[in-house]
Amino acid sequence: MNPVALRRISPLILVLALVAGACSDGEAPDAATGSLLPADPYELPEFDPASFDALLSELKGTPVLVNVWASWCGPCEQEAPHLAAAHAEYGDRVQFLGVDILDERESARRFMHDYGWTYPSVYDLPGAIRDDLGLLGQPVTLFYDASGGLVTTWTGVLNEDVLRENLEMISS
């Protein structure tokens, strides 16, 4: 492209970039750490399968529990207190991460607050992360070892014993 044409379209490119930035939800990775993991557990940044995979890659070196849930899900409510208690016990050794699907953000935040969740969740309105993982329904909990390998998947309500057994397995 010649310099004259470039000078003519430069203002247009700038305007388009500003408009695109203004239309975003403003929920970029944490600028202070450069991490995709939200520093505020109630932030609920929007993720898709690609950003979720990038986050899992970023977390390699730490065991990870991923729980797929929704605020309107009865079985999710049943296991929520167990997850909060397990996080209090294992949170220094295992990164807990929720994936809120097919939900409204404010309902999800209220659910997290009501059950005392202090670990981050990401927001996936269409449920694309769950679908990309080949999972059906919710709750579903995935346990990853420190090398990033999927150790086991639990579909349905986690009881305390199953939760503790799997957390011990990935954190030892």
Which positions does each model-derived feature cover?
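A short beta-strand-turn-helix
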Residues: 41-64
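C-terminal motif of bacterial Sec signal peptides marking the signal peptidase cleavage site
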Residues: 18-22
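Thiol/disulfide oxidoreductase modules built on the thioredoxin-like
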Residues: 110-118, 125-171
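Hydrophobic beta-strand anchors of alpha/beta hydrolase catalytic cores
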Residues: 65-66, 96, 141
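Bacterial signal peptide processing site
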Residues: 23-27, 74
